[in-house]
Amino acid sequence: MSAVSQPQAAHAPLEKPASTAILCNTCGNVCKGEVLRVQNKHFHIRCFVCKACGCDLAEGGFFVRQGEHICTRDYQRLYGTRCFSCDCFIEGEVVSALGKTYHPDCFVCAVCRLPFPPGDRVTFNGKDCMCQKCSPPTLVGNSAHVAQGLRSCGGCGLEIKNGQALVALDKHWHLGCFKCKTCGKLLNAEYISKDGLPYCEADYHTKFGIRCDGCEKYITGRVLEAGEKHYHPSCALCVRCGQMFSEGEEMYLQGSSIWHPACRQAARTEDKSKETRTSSESIVSVPASSTSGSPSRVIYAKLGDEILDYRDLAALPKNKAIYNIDRPDMISYSPYISHSAVGDRQSYGEGDQDDRSYKQCRTSSPSSAGSVSLGHYTPTSRSPQHYSRPGSESGRSTPSLSVHSDSRPPSSTYQQAPRHFHVPDTGVKDNIYRKPPIYKQHAARRLDVEDSSFDQDSRKKTTWLLLKGDADTRTNSPDLDSQSLSLSSGADQEPLQRMPGDSLYSRFPYSKPDTLPGPRKDGLDLRNANLAPCGADPDASWGTREYKIYPYDSLIVTNRIRVKLPKDVDRTRLERHLSPEEFQEVFGMSIEEFDRLALWKRNDLKKKALLF
């Protein structure tokens, strides 16, 4: 017993010299007159009281616990041990049996009501304790085997002779034999049985336990089952309203998300209106820009084998399939450079990837500042409906470009580069409402003038070859030499105008790409002007767009709290703003491995990471 019972505190006169003051251990003041001394400590009579009730301890017994003085009644109430038989507090000797405490006089045989003699064997039948005289005698025949079985240990199989026995799983056990079947740990508290064998809680869960699909911890007690998934009742929360599911209530399961049926229907309605608005707004163009040399962008949609331009898309009725696309890919644009005189106006289509498509199609070398990439085009049997002429009011044209290896001098006039691509009507009229259009990124390729042969197989490709470059002020600057656009090999470049024998066409299946050879007269090496491919998947790698890196905490979104994200983040691809190290830590994989997953799997991982 940690507390020490003390006799009545004795009055002690002050026998020390007057020069040495005696201080009260409770109030700290000088003791004068009669004082109490307890374990070499002195107290005023009025200061020596119970810590719990404040009663005077000078006239009665007390207990000391952790330096505090407590009266007998309060100590037993707060820290005392009760007898399992009489339910009174135990003072003095105590008997412990089967995890219970008794007064020595209260631990008696359940039959004869006599205390157990010292050293006598005690028989516990699962309910009462009996002495050796009152225990059932050993019977003959079948009864003898039953009695023998009750006294045999369920673990080692030996007879339980002297000492205590433990009854569990309808068997008697030696105290040291009741162990976990897997790890061998003694089970003196809780245990879980399986097929008549005892297991500790940890091993039982490891072998037979059910994990919660929400918190991934083992489930003990009540379990909520939804399909093949199991949850703690407190872990099964609706992702929309955050409320628990009551017993017997219907549940809508989608991936790892759980919905109330009403909440799921409301979310579907919101998503449908949001997607319809996004699809309809994605084909709207802004007014034309008056900036000279700005990159023009053309909207295309591929429907089967037919290519639709912006005019065809704009002519679609609002109730047709173009407005019912289920989250289409982002409409991408194929920019090219239009050289125009000062004062000319250029219109461009603006989409969701303006900045990204423009950065992708810029060259990675400074040597491309004044270069124009030209390409071979396979002639077709049709002529375009529109082409560019100086002073044209419409400003709409189709490119008619060719590379000539002859040495004809450059013309004194400079024709404007085309500003828009338009696809003429084809002979076959497909039904444009038969299925939703598929938006494609048009690839821009480097062109090589040195190779003039056409590959017959490459004519079947559907990738468009577009004129691109940087819109400088070459048409307006007087410092530019008239031969600045000529080739270094001596073959001057033909002016950008329609030549006799050239064909204009609206579809451009390209052959083998060519590049401009050799360094030019102005000292720029065109062979080093590596053009970034514009036909790559805009979300396939980190390199297609420079995403600003933010910490993971600033990108997390939740359903209950409206989080204000940074302004310049892509809300549909928040994971792209993570650093590679933090991306690995959050998703457990690299960005390349993440991109190879299916779309539903990526969305599922983003939901778990609160980035969706």
Curated annotation (Swiss-Prot):
Keywords: Cytoplasm, LIM domain, Metal-binding, Phosphoprotein, Repeat, Zinc. Its main location: cytoplasm. It comes from the Eukaryota. Pfam families: AbLIM_anchor, LIM, VHP. The modification Phosphothreonine is found at residue 473. Residues 394-416 have a biased composition (Polar residues). Coiled coil: none annotated. The keyword Metal-binding applies. InterPro entries: AbLIM_anchor (IPR032402), Actin-binding_LIM (IPR051618), Villin_headpiece (IPR003128), Villin_headpiece_dom_sf (IPR036886), Znf_LIM (IPR001781). GO terms for biological process: cytoskeleton organization; lamellipodium assembly; positive regulation of transcription by RNA polymerase II; transcription by RNA polymerase II. Zn(2+) 1 binds at residues 83, 86, 103, 106. PROSITE patterns: HP, LIM_DOMAIN_1, LIM_DOMAIN_2. Residues 269-278 have a biased composition (Basic and acidic residues). SMART domains: LIM, VHP. Residues 279-295, 364-373, 477-489 have a biased composition (Low complexity). SUPFAM superfamilies: Glucocorticoid receptor-like (DNA-binding domain), VHP, Villin headpiece domain. Residues 544-612 form the HP domain. Residues 22-81, 81-141, 151-210, 210-270 form the LIM zinc-binding domain. It is found in: Cytoplasm. Disulfide bonds: none annotated. Zn(2+) 2 binds at residues 109, 112, 131, 134. Zn(2+) 3 binds at residues 212, 215, 232, 235. Residues 269-295, 341-433, 471-520 are annotated as: Disordered. May act as scaffold protein. May stimulate ABRA activity and ABRA-dependent SRF transcriptional activity. This is Actin-binding LIM protein 2. It comes from Rattus norvegicus (Rat). The gene is Ablim2.
